[in-house]
Amino acid sequence: MKRIALFGGTGKTGKEFLQKALENEYHIKVLARSPEKVDTQSPHLEVIKGDVLNPAEVNATVTGTDIAVSLFGHVKGSPKWLQSDGTSNILSAMLDHGVEKIISLSGGGLPFHKDEPKFADKAIRLIMKVAVPKVLNDAIRHAEILKDSDRKWVIVRGPRLTEEPEKGNYRVGWVGVNASTSIGRADLADFILKQVEEDT
């Protein structure tokens, strides 16, 4: 069973992923600025107090693992390049410890060349550019950092997130083509875990 280095495990989606991964008997090392927010207990869980912007603490989290899962994101007061700099730290630690693959969660506003955004999609992206340019620019930059790395990577772009119970069925695709416009966090966590299980 793969050992997971988890970043962002105390957020709403992170908690869903952590619980599901532990239920599937994965061993997890989670980095948390506030370890008390990790309200799950398991012999397969190790919690490390630290910050994704601290290279040494990221390195300690990645050591002894097989794959990195990055679910952290901006909150009020976050540094401008939180996702980019945190991702760079994770990639550096992965290189040090021979970890080959990272899965990174981002928002549906992150553009991709296979997207065919409809009017509503374009409107949402325009709103993001105006309302939260820091978040969108950081997401774009973090994607470029992943693309320029020599690690295997998967970027999961989540649409509007809901708190509905897990359904077990959801659509995956490109914006405006065949992707869902919303998804429950539990189903999103399920999809992310499936990417952990994939070998490519």
Indicate residue ranges for each PLM-predicted region.
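N-terminal Rossmann NAD(P)H-binding glycine-rich loop of SDR-like oxidoreductase domains
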Residues: 4-24
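Conserved Rossmann-fold cofactor-binding substructure of NAD(P)-dependent oxidoreductases
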Residues: 43-65
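N-terminal Rossmann-fold cofactor-binding loop
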Residues: 31-36, 51-52
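Substrate-positioning beta->alpha
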Residues: 87, 138, 156, 180-193
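NAD(P)-cofactor binding segment of oxidoreductase domains
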Residues: 75-104, 134, 141
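Glycine/proline-rich active-site loop of Rossmann-fold NAD(P)-dependent oxidoreductases
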Residues: 165-168, 195-200
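Conserved beta-loop-beta element that borders a ligand/cofactor-binding pocket
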Residues: 143-164
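N-terminal Rossmann-like NAD(P) cofactor-binding module of classical short-chain dehydrogenase/reductase
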Residues: 62, 66-69, 103
